[in-house]
């Protein structure tokens, strides 16, 4: 039973480390651009979009589709970078072991 007690302590320690890491990851930010920097999106480690900046030069009322595509591309890239950041940070805690459900 002593081994089980040690295992439980280690699990609690890992859980505390995980909670701390999730808080730290949530504070980190990534950004992505599209259209050569015409659209910039900022996202945090919780995959929440924080800001979208659009260069006025790209705004054309006759071609809204192009702007929509640029915003979508920048958002998707920012979210991809955020997921990658989470995996890298969690990999430090898990030693690179991919554990299902450990993402944020």
Q: For the regions a protein language model found, what residue spans apply to each?
A:
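Short, well-ordered turn and helix-capping elements at secondary-structure junctions
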Residues: 29, 36, 56-58
